[in-house]
């Protein structure tokens, strides 16, 4: 974490702190921990992301901000997931997804160079080279190649679904975007070994990312994968308050239908957007997973002190 901070301070980012206890669990698609504030008689949540507060700071005039802190998500535990973990989030005004990807790669190189370790890492019996430049590939292209079906933003769901059914591929999605995302998660993500930026995420799973001007339903979003795990998530931020309000209303409908991970409506954040968020590039970077790969530990529990345990009795 010291080297990550050094890099960001050296590139004129300002380190800030935002609330851990929040009236709405926003900024990510995740299930929160809930508590109650007795003095205010108000249900509150441990943060699932600092994103919406950091972007408020950008609206307020802080052009380059970052925070390193604990995130809490009331979800499953496995080799790469813990309910409490450490995240780096940064936001830069007048930047976009491409600038953020460049920054992530440069920041990781800074860590490798200062630790003086080989950029060829061994993890879970496999090798991956972190020497750059890292690949950047569209999710739609990966899915198209995997299944031998040309899929893009204007593909018809009926055409794609029938071809997948012919291949005996099971799926639950009802739109092209959700179908592409489901196929990527289930069949492709775990196969990515060398660090790779997967770009072009469907708008249905990217409520805060800017939609591409020339590809309806596709966003300027990336995730960085290595050794089959997500290391980072970033995008060109959605800055239109009307579009943001519409997307959050769609998420609220999903939540009312029983989707516990869907995002809540957040009128306060939409109101903040009305004051003007400049074009902004955002990043979320999983520090624990990065450390796992650096030191070759197969489980996230081995790089986090005092993980939660079930009582013996």
Predicted regions and their residues:
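A translation/RNA-centric and nucleic-acid-associated enzymatic feature enriched
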Residues: 19-99, 103-110, 128, 133-313
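Histidine-anchored, small-residue-rich loop motif
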Residues: 1
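Short, glycine/acidic-rich hinge or "gate" loops at secondary-structure transitions
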Residues: 17-21, 116-127
């Amino acid at each position: 974490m010291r080297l990550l901070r050094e890099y960001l301070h050296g590139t004129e980012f300002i380190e800030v702190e935002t609330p851990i206890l929040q009236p709405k669990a926003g900024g990510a698609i995740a299930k929160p921990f809930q508590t109650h504030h007795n003095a205010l008689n108000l249900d509150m949540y441990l943060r699932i992301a600092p994103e919406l507060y950091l972007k408020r700071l950008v609206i307020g005039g802080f052009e380059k901000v970052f925070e390193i802190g604990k995130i809490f998500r009331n979800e499953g535990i496995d080799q790469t997931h813990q309910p409490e973990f450490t995240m780096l989030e940064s936001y830069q005004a007048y930047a976009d997804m491409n600038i953020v990807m460049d920054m992530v790669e440069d920041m990781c190189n800074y860590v490798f160079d200062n630790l003086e370790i080989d950029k060829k890492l061994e993890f879970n019996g496999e090798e991956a080279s972190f020497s750059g430049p890292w690949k950047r590939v569209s999710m739609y292209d990966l899915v198209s190649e995997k299944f031998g079906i040309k899929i893009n933003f204007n593909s018809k769901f009926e055409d794609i679904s029938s071809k997948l059914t012919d291949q005996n591929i099971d799926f639950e999605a009802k739109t092209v975007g959700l179908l592409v995302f489901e196929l990527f998660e289930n069949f492709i993500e775990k196969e990515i070994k060398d660090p790779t930026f997967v770009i072009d995420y469907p708008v249905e799973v990217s409520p805060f990312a800017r939609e591409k001007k020339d590809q309806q339903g596709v966003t300027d979003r990336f995730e960085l994968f290595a050794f089959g795990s997500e290391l980072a998530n970033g995008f060109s931020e959605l800055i239109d308050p009307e579009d943001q309000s519409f997307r959050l209303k769609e998420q609220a409908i999903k939540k009312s239908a029983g989707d516990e991970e869907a995002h809540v409506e957040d009128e306060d954040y939409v109101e903040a957007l009305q004051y003007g968020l400049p074009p902004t590039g955002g990043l979320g970077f999983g520090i624990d997973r990065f450390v796992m790969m650096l030191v070759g530990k197969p489980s996230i529990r081995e790089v986090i002190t005092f993980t939660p345990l079930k009582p013996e009795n």
